[in-house]
Structures are given as structure tokens and as C-alpha cells.
Amino acid sequence: LPHLPVGLRKMDGAVLGAADRPVIVVARRKSSRAWLSFIVAHELAHVVLGHVRPGVSIVDVSLQDMSTYASESATDRQEGEADALALRLLGDGVADTLIANWLPNWGPAQIAAASRLAARAHRLEAGHLALRHGFRHQRWPEAVSALGFLSEDLDAEGELLAQLKRNVDLDRVADDLQDMVAQITGWGRVA
């Protein structure tokens, strides 16, 4: 959702217990498959682990805001469980073993090169390895720059919004919420 109202706390994603099904919301405005795959895997983990019930919402703050993340996740067992399952889904121990020998002070080009080689050899997502390295060593700028070297970006936001538009029947959304849906998705005013 690219157009959330100003003043809302920065978040990467959320999962909502809407009626009889979970709804995953991706709010991060990055176009990297690696970022998006982790966010979706993390939110899906909340569902699989039974953290979400009808009427319950879990909003995950920005992972890149390490000070907020560290203080909140240390006391939030569910976030830790969701992170662990998401990381397992995206690379299990293989990814951790691969990046364990990578130097913490590597620059973006080194991270990208190592990520690409390891990804090919082990059928993993190179961008995920780069971000996992950034998370492990709290070196987000280098990890994000490495994604640029990998050229793994796509118009993920556009693709997700197109899928949402194909699958959301606005006629089933309450009249007073249609304008809000149009605003936060950037679809323009609903007639």
C-alpha cells in the first residue's frame, strides 16, 4: 500500500484476521523481491503459527529501523517465532552457513558477488542472502546497495497492486471505506 496516511508508524507489513481468512498487507515501498519475499514469509509465518485469529491484527514495524526492531522484538515472542520461520522458509540453515564466513565489513559489490555465486550454487535468492548479511551485521546501507548490483528489482509494487485490483471487488467494500481503499492503493477516487 504505497499511499498510507501521513503520521502512521513506519511498517513493512501486517496480517489481519478478516472474517474467516487472513489478509497480508505489504506496506514497504521497496521493489526488491528479497524484501518482499521476507515480508510475505514473515506475515505468512504469523498465520501458520496461529498468531492471527479473526479480528486480530499484527503490524510489523520496519525491519530496517534496527533500534525500534531490537527493542520490540526482544520482548515479543511472536515476532521472533515469525522471523525464525520466515528465515527457515527462505534459506534455512544453508543461508546462515553460507554467510557465516562473509566478512562484516564487505562493501556492496563484494556482498553482491558472494550472494550471486552462493545463490546459483544453492538455489537461493541472491537478494535474500545480501539482506540476511545486512541484518546479521547491522549493515543495511551496504546490503541495500548490494541489491542494486544484483539488478534483481522489478516493479513489485505495481505487480502487487495489480494483483490486489484483480482480486478485490470494491462493490463488496463498504461505501465509507471505498475512498480509503482507493487512497491507500493509489487507484484514484472510486466513483
Predicted regions and their residues:
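Active-site hotspot residues in diverse enzymes, especially metal/ion-binding acidic/histidine motifs
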Residues: 1-191
